[in-house]
């Protein structure tokens, strides 16, 4: 569905119908569809239990927790946080500025500069202290507060009482450091302002990764905290933040948690950014802020905190536990994107993963100038807002919010609050170069001052050390460490690009990449998960017949063509969610996967689930393997990899697929013993071929004729006419065991080859209907060399035999795999052969020169490999099928990127050189097209 063409009532009808179908209420669904004239188009957010169910369950969980505290610890924590916020607001109201604004601004600037230099050291010490010495931390906090009081009398006087309240009100949260100390201590459990490493490391990541659900609870908490006043946020303790992270998963089931999580994620970055004020905006915190805008789309009030200065943002910290989100891969819960979390985490990991930060920038770009202005205004008004409004914010998350950054970065109102910030974020232009940390610091200072002035003018709360939204740019800037600051800044630059977020039935995001910005010196590319639906392309590759583990459900969001990227589901959600990888002209890469419905609504912007894997897949500049999304040579320019269509191809597992030579048809088959031909443009079925008596293991089109052949565990090979569905043309029987693979010769139309479990290879003549040759050499998969057909690659156990087609002599025996080979594939030229085992991929040269030599090698990083295919347009890019995800390997740069794709094992891949499509078949019963 297009982003701009949708109506709320019609979309509701579509999802009600989808819910009825998912509940197997077929008669009711048909009646409702007929009477309500409901569209038959597939829903954009295809949640396993129905989008309405996942949406409703999240809110029900929070509602019931108000009457039954034991129902959900996460929900209870959420409610408790609201109470704490109310207390903090009272404290803030009682507090009065004692120092002039100018003095405060100067003090804040000085403190921030100091914090930039001291945050990391303090974070490390504080992390240890938090775990084992809460009392020591309190003492340190007091000392730091005294120092800060000297510099910022007002801020510190306000903060100690808030801290005391936090300690009293939240026994779990033992202490909250001063604005400086707080972010630092939170670094482990929350978002430490000090260093990205501190934030990422330790508690935050483990919490989120261990508990995808925790992401959702964190999101909800972060959202509330964002609404809180800056002082209020400070009052929250680190302990509370940690608890939120721990409990989030409990509060909501994976799908629900993902919904809350996405909502919280949007708000979280803002709080995190804000709380880093006195502590000095660390690139991590800044990155979070940038990310926040994307999440802010969900909740304007949440967005307000992003722009509003905040001394301490425990909630942000919670959210800031980006590690958690990323642990779950930005697509944390059922595909719900946790932009805030992932982005925060990316900020934390800036040094390690600058690209992560850039993702947050992309989110910011997605906001329109008007939305940005709204966010700024909301922040200004945030202080005056009542606590009761915070309770509504969660609902607001569900409301559609469209936010885009104007060329100036923020809307005009935003410009007022944060002038000059937008300029750094300009969509077309590059942000500040990596080295311009000084510039960023200056911008940051200016923004802080302006924000303070605006707040004072607006009346309401006294000025506080405000991490100030430091709109995307500033956020990135302040890390004492040149590298981190550079990365964050660079990412911020990448951020620069206008974008709009809209909410369709399935949230479709337009993510205008200023991926150009990503070009920035940092060289890190940010990847954003994107979900989309549409036609896809693929070419044949390996298939597997083994059972696949169950996968978690996920919901995809629609994706708009072009440079617009919609958020896909979180990896947790499952392979079902659609995902997309996009590389801007600058070579920046964005990868998105379908996000949960709520996340799609406003925060579809970014899952961050892909962030870890996608980080810099296409970045030539970074050698960091984490930057999996670095530029792939020419691939980096304008390269996109997006799911364009999906179809349930079977009632059981799908094991194989292949394109016709013209790319107009796609064939798939699997455990249901049937082969289905699909029109690739519409993915509508053309023909179903039913004659096999056991599961089909391989399916191949003839290169020159509209014929296709299938092999099966019934020990037969059958040849079919694509235009005649009545019966098979030939049935070849002769194998003594299950036939595992087959292939047509590229030139000799009459020749077909097959292999079986007994390592026997047979040549068949289609015209004569007889077996012409039998020899040993292959048992898993066989593939003829494209174009010339000189060689036949046959995998057997852990080696690949390259046989001469004419003499059947083994020309090369390619050894090097420790485990059995699952798949082999040739590049379109026939010069290179790839072999895949569960732990390794090897690429061999066979065209010219030193044949049989391994020229590229990739080891598994945790997700076992299963199938492979060379990209039809970029020969240096190998697409590898894994469990639930696709691995994109840029061999020339030795960079990899993971893209959530299915909810089961991806057994087969296929490519069409005619259309540029890539097809993936999976045990989740789906066949998807990518381009």
UniProtKB/Swiss-Prot annotation:
Residues 1-88 are annotated as: Required for SEU-binding. Residues 149-220, 450-582 are annotated as: Disordered. Induction: Induced by exposures to biotic stress (e.g. Agrobacterium tumefaciens) and abiotic stress (e.g. hypoxia, cycloheximide, 2,4-dichlorophenoxyacetic acid, AgNO(3) and aminoethoxyvinylglycine). Repressed by exposures to biotic stress (e.g. nematode and Botrytis cinerea) and abiotic stress (e.g. salt, genotoxic, wounding, drought and oxidative stress). Keywords: Developmental protein, Differentiation, Flowering, Nucleus, Repeat, Repressor, Transcription, Transcription regulation, WD repeat. WD repeats lie at residues 641-679, 683-721, 726-765, 769-804, 808-845, 852-890, 893-931. Residues 8-40 form the LisH domain. Gene3D superfamilies: YVTN repeat-like/Quinoprotein amine dehydrogenase (2.130.10.10). Residues 192-219, 503-521, 529-540 have a biased composition (Polar residues). One of its GO terms (cellular component) is nucleus. Expressed in young flower primordia, later becomes localized to petals, stamens and carpels. Is also expressed in vegetative tissues. Expressed in roots, stems, leaves, seedlings, apex, flowers, flower organs and seeds. It is found in: Nucleus. Its main location: nucleus. Residues 149-183, 471-483, 541-561, 573-582 have a biased composition (Low complexity). GO terms for biological process: cell differentiation; cellular response to external biotic stimulus; DNA damage response; flower development; galacturonan metabolic process; meristem maintenance; mucilage extrusion from seed coat; mucilage metabolic process involved in seed coat development. Disruption phenotype: Slight defects in seed mucilage extrusion. Ectopic expression of AGAMOUS, leading to the replacement of sepals by carpels and stamens and of petals by stamens. Wide and serrated vegetative leaf lamina, narrow cauline leaves, large palisade cells and reduced fertility. In plants lacking both LUG and LUH, embryo lethality and abnormal flowers. Enhance the polarity and growth defects of fil yab3 and luh/+ lug mutant leaves, being partially abaxialized. Forms a corepressor complex with SEU; LUG is the transcription repressor subunit and SEU the specific DNA-binding adapter. Interacts with AGL24-AP1 and SVP-AP1 dimers, and possibly with SEP3, especially when complexed to SEU. Interacts with MED14, HDA19 and CDKE-1. Binds to YAB3, YAB5 and YAB1/FIL; these complexes promote adaxial cell identity in leaves as well as embryonic shoot apical meristem (SAM) initiation and postembryonic SAM maintenance. Transcription repressor subunit of the SEU-LUG transcriptional corepressor of the C class floral homeotic gene AGAMOUS during the early stages of floral meristem development. Is part of the A class cadastral complex that define the boundaries between the A and C class homeotic genes expression and function. Interacts together with APETALA2 and SEUSS to repress AGAMOUS expression. Also plays a role in ovule and pollen development. Implicated in embryo and floral development. This is Transcriptional corepressor LEUNIG.
């Amino acid at each position: 569905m297009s982003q701009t063409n949708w109506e709320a009532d019609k979309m509701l009808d579509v999802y009600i119908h989808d819910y009825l179908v998912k509940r197997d209420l077929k008669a009711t669904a048909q009646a409702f569809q007929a009477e309500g004239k409901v569209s038959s188009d597939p829903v954009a957010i295809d949640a396993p239990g129905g989008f309405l169910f996942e949406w409703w369950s999240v809110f029900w969980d929070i509602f019931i927790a108000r009457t039954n505290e034991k129902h959900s610890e996460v929900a209870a924590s959420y409610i408790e946080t609201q109470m704490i916020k109310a207390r903090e607001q009272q404290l803030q109201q009682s507090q009065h500025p004692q120092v002039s604004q100018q003095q405060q601004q100067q003090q804040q600037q000085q403190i921030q500069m100091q914090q930039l230099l001291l945050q990391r050291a303090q974070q490390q010490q504080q992390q240890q202290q938090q775990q084992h010495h809460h009392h020591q931390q309190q003492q340190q906090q007091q000392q730091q507060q005294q120092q800060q009081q000297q510099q910022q009398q007002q801020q510190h006087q306000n903060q100690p009482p808030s801290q005391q309240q936090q300690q009293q009100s939240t026994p779990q949260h033992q202490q909250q450091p001063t604005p400086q100390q707080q972010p630092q201590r939170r670094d482990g459990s929350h978002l430490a302002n000090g260093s990205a490493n501190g934030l990422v490391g330790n508690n935050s990541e483990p919490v989120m990764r261990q508990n995808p659900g925790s992401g959702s609870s964190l999101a909800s908490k972060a959202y509330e905290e964002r609404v809180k006043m800056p002082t209020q946020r400070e009052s929250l303790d680190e302990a509370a933040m940690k608890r939120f992270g721990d409990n989030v998963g409990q509060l909501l089931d994976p799908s629900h948690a993902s919904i809350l999580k996405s909502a919280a994620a949007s708000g979280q970055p803002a709080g995190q950014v804000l709380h880093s004020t006195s502590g000095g905006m660390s690139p991590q915190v800044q990155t979070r802020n940038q990310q926040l805008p994307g999440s802010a789309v969900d909740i304007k009030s949440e967005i307000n905190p992003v722009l509003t200065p905040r001394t301490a943002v425990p909630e942000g910290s919670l959210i800031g536990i980006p590690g958690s989100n990323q642990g779950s891969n930005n697509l944390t819960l059922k595909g719900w994107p946790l932009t805030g979390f992932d982005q925060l985490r990316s900020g934390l990991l800036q040094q390690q993963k600058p690209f992560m930060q850039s993702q947050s920038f992309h989110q910011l770009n997605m906001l329109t100038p008007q939305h940005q202005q709204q966010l700024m205004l909301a922040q200004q008004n945030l202080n005056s807002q009542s606590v009761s409004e915070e309770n509504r914010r969660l609902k607001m998350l569900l409301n559609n919010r469209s936010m885009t950054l104007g060329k100036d970065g923020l809307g005009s109102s935003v410009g007022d609050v944060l002038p000059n910030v937008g300029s750094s974020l300009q969509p077309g232009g590059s942000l500040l170069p990596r080295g311009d940390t000084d510039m960023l610091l200056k911008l940051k200072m200016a923004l802080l001052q302006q924000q303070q002035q605006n707040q004072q003018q607006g009346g309401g709360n006294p000025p506080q050390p405000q991490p100030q939204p430091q709109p995307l740019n500033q956020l990135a800037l302040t890390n004492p460490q040149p590298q981190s600051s550079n990365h964050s800044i660079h990412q911020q630059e990448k951020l620069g690009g206008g974008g709009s977020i809209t909410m369709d039935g399935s949230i479709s995001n337009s993510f205008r990449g200023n991926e150009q910005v990503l070009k920035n010196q940092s060289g890190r590319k940010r990847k954003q998960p994107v979900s989309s639906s549409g036609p896809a392309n693929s070419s044949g590759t390996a298939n597997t017949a083994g059972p696949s583990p169950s996968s978690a459900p996920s919901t995809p969001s629609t994706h708009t063509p072009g440079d617009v990227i919609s958020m896909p589901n979180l990896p947790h959600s499952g392979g079902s969610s659609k995902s997309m990888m996009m590389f801007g002209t600058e070579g920046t890469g964005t990868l998105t996967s379908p996000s949960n419905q709520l996340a799609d609504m406003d925060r579809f912007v970014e899952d961050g689930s892909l962030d870890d894997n996608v980080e810099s897949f296409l970045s030539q500049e970074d050698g960091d393997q984490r930057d999996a999304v670095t530029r792939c040579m020419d691939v980096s320019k304008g390269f996109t990899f997006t799911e364009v269509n999906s179809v349930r191809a079977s009632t059981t597992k799908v094991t194989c697929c292949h394109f016709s030579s013209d790319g107009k048809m796609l064939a798939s088959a699997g455990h249901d013993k049937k082969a289905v031909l699909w029109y690739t443009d519409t993915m509508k079925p053309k023909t179903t071929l039913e004659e096999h008596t056991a599961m089909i293991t391989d399916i191949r089109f003839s290169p020159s004729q509209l014929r296709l052949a299938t092999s099966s565990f019934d020990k037969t090979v059958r040849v079919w006419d694509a235009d005649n569905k009545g019966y098979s043309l030939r049935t070849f029987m002769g194998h003594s065991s299950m036939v595992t693979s087959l292939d047509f010769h590229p030139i000799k139309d009459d020749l077909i080859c097959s292999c079986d479990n007994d390592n026997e290879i047979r040549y068949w003549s289609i015209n004569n209907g007889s077996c012409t040759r039998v020899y040993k050499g292959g048992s898993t998969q066989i593939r003829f060399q494209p174009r010339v057909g000189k060689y036949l690659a046959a995998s057997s156990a852990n080696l690949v035999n390259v046989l001469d087609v004419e003499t059947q002599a083994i020309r090369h025996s390619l050894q090097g795999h420790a485990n059995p080979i699952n798949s082999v594939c040739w590049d379109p030229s026939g010069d290179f052969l790839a072999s895949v085992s569960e732990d390794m991929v090897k690429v061999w040269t066979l065209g010219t020169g030193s044949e049989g030599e391994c020229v590229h090698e990739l080891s598994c990083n945790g997700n076992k490999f299963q199938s492979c295919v060379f990209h039809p347009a970029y020969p240096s890019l190998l697409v590898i099928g894994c469990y639930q995800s696709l691995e994109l390997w840029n061999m020339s740069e030795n960079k990899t990127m993971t893209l959530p794709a299915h909810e089961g094992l991806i057994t087969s891949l296929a490519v069409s050189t005619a259309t540029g499509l890539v097809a993936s078949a999976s045990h989740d019963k789906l066949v998807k097209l990518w381009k």
